[in-house]
């Protein structure tokens, strides 16, 4: 670890060194979706659930074309038993070139991260001194623009329908695209550095993605330009942060972030209900001094989880309403946004 701490375990997966920001998730299930979520690019994931790998790996659970996390830390990688499984977790990691460490005291590691905050770390088969040297030579997570590594390179057209949603791909999850497609709209995926290619759509959506949002001035500037058209705009996770930045909000880093599929979010504007939701974010928004209004908060720490605009058709969520993994109770957010598109998108 960056502070010199060493956690020993059994190497699984690829026999190589991986460096990344060490984070943790408290999700009990959903490790295939978690590992393939592009938002984890640049990070080493620690699973607090002690048994990971119970149901193997199946193609229909993946959120991208492969594992995007840099590495995995867990307590026990179990032998899989599931009729859809095509390989074990260990086999998947090895074939993907991703290292992992099992039999780690994950409780002690997570307690340290909660107390001192997330930090850089390295895992691999080498001595601690070699891992520390690799860590020193690697760029810090907060200084790398990861979205370029997970975005499409050229526009992609998907689906059929009267309405078109332009999706700026910062590392969009497959399940988000599916939520739009199953509602009968067309999706135009565009590279994160070519946002203007989606301006001709009925609405713009800024996707989830990895890394420090403060490095994405090139994207927030395009969003600011788009806002002038007064057309519908939505963002999830990183997209929520980018839209907030474009409208003047501040961004700050959380001590250890929200990464789980059991986080409560309270809707203080539309339904008045509290929902259990899926999260994966290490940064948060401070909208004070802007025209953005808060519609959802995380009751444990008061983090802003949803924003809207009283005069413009803008709606954002910091959490993942598509879930995958996790509760599906807030998928209605997509329906709410499409109603905005029906009213304002033509």
Curated annotation (Swiss-Prot):
Q: What class of enzyme is it?
A: ligase
Name of the molecule in the record = Carbamoyl phosphate synthase small chain
What ranges does the record give for the region CPSase, renumbered to this chain? 1-160
Partners and quaternary state?
Answer: Composed of two chains; the small (or glutamine) chain promotes the hydrolysis of glutamine to ammonia, which is used by the large (or ammonia) chain to synthesize carbamoyl phosphate. Tetramer of heterodimers (alpha,beta)4.
Task: Write out the pathway annotation from the protein's UniProt entry.
Answer: Amino-acid biosynthesis; L-arginine biosynthesis; carbamoyl phosphate from bicarbonate: step 1/1; Pyrimidine metabolism; UMP biosynthesis via de novo pathway; (S)-dihydroorotate from bicarbonate: step 1/3
GO annotation, cellular component aspect? carbamoyl-phosphate synthase complex; cytoplasm
Pfam families annotated for this entry?
CPSase_sm_chain, GATase
Active site (catalytic residues):
237, 320, 322
Similarity remark: Belongs to the CarA family.
Q: What does this protein do?
A: Small subunit of the glutamine-dependent carbamoyl phosphate synthetase (CPSase). CPSase catalyzes the formation of carbamoyl phosphate from the ammonia moiety of glutamine, carbonate, and phosphate donated by ATP, constituting the first step of 2 biosynthetic pathways, one leading to arginine and/or urea and the other to pyrimidine nucleotides. The small subunit (glutamine amidotransferase) binds and cleaves glutamine to supply the large subunit with the substrate ammonia.
- PANTHER family reported for this sequence: CARBAMOYL-PHOSPHATE SYNTHASE SMALL CHAIN, MULTIFUNCTIONAL TRYPTOPHAN BIOSYNTHESIS PROTEIN-RELATED
Q: Which organism is it from?
A: Pyrobaculum aerophilum (strain ATCC 51768 / DSM 7523 / JCM 9630 / CIP 104966 / NBRC 100827 / IM2)
All copies of domain Glutamine amidotransferase type-1, residue ranges: 164-346
**Per the record, what are the reactions this protein catalyses?**
hydrogencarbonate + L-glutamine + 2 ATP + H2O = carbamoyl phosphate + L-glutamate + 2 ADP + phosphate + 2 H(+)
Recorded GO molecular functions are: ATP binding; carbamoyl-phosphate synthase (glutamine-hydrolyzing) activity; glutaminase activity
């Amino acid at each position: 670890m960056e502070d010199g701490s060493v956690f020993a375990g059994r190497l699984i997966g690829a026999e190589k060194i991986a460096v990344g920001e060490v984070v943790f998730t408290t999700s009990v299930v959903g490790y295939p979706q978690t590992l393939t979520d592009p938002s984890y690019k640049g990070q080493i994931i620690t699973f607090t659930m002690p048994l990971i790998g119970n149901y193997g790996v199946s193609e229909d659970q993946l959120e991208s074309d492969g594992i995007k996390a840099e590495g995995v830390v867990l307590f026990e990688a179990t032998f899989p038993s599931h009729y859809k499984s095509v390989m074990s977790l260990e086999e998947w990691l090895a074939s993907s070139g991703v290292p992992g460490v099992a039999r780690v005291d994950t409780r002690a590691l997570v307690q340290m991260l909660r107390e001192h905050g997330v930090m850089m770390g390295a895992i691999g088969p080498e001595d601690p001194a070699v891992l520390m040297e690799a860590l020193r030579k690697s760029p810090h997570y907060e200084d790398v623009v990861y979205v370029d590594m997970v975005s499409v390179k050229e526009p992609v057209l998907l689906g059929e329908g009267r309405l078109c949603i332009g999706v700026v791909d910062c590392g969009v999850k497959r399940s988000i695209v599916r939520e739009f497609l199953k509602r009968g709209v067309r999706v135009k995926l565009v590279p994160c550095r070519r946002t203007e290619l989606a301006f001709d759509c009925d609405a713009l959506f800024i996707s989830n993605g990895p890394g420090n949002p403060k490095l994405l001035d090139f994207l927030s500037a395009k969003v600011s330009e788009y806002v002038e058209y007064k057309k519908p705009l939505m963002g999830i996770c990183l997209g929520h942060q980018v839209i907030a930045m474009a409208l003047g909000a501040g961004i700050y880093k959380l001590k250890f972030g929200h990464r789980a599929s059991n986080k409560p979010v309270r809707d203080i504007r539309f339904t008045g209900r509290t929902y259990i939701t899926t999260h994966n974010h290490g940064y948060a928004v401070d909208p004070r001094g802007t025209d953005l209004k808060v519609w959802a908060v995380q009751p444990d720490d008061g983090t802003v989880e949803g924003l809207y605009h009283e005069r413009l058709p803008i709606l954002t969520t910091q959490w993942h309403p598509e879930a995958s993994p996790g509760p599906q109770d807030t998928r209605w957010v997509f329906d709410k946004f499409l109603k905005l598109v029906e009213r304002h998108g033509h």
